[in-house]
Each structure stands twice: as C-alpha cells, then as structure tokens.
Amino acid sequence: TFTPNSHYWLGQLYFAKKQDKEAVKSFAAVVSYKDSNKRADALVKLGDIAARNNNATQAKKYYQQVVTEYPNSASAKVAKTHL
C-alpha cells in the first residue's frame, strides 16, 4: 500500500528539518507495517535519530534489528557501518 511509503517520506522530511519527535512517529508507523519495503530503511532512520539525540544504546538496537531481520539488504550494510 501507499500508506507506509507516505509515512516514510514524511519522516524523511521531518528528519531533514530536525523535527525528531515527528520523524519518530512517522518512521515508527512504517515499522508497524511488517511487509513494507521501507521498513528496514525506517529502522535505520530511527537509529539515526537515536544517535543524533545521544542515545547510543537505542541506536544500536535499531541498527542491530535491521542487520538481524534484513541481513542481505542495502539497509543492513548501512546499519553495520553504525555498529
């Protein structure tokens, strides 16, 4: 469906504007769609937001989740660079 993609791009907009609370809401909505093709990317972005807000432990959890759930994806390669 288009819904997760809409949430993803809205999250990207908020992320770029450093409106992290809104970005987290949008990316979390994407993650709730287990079959979304943007789910792994949204998890990376949630990790990026956590890292930007000095929450290294939470960031690592998001990045590790990407590597575990999507091991052969481009998102996993990105996540690994942050671990």
What is each stretch, according to the model?
Residues 1-3, 32-38, 67-77:
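Short solvent-exposed coil/turn linkers within tandem alpha-helical repeat scaffolds
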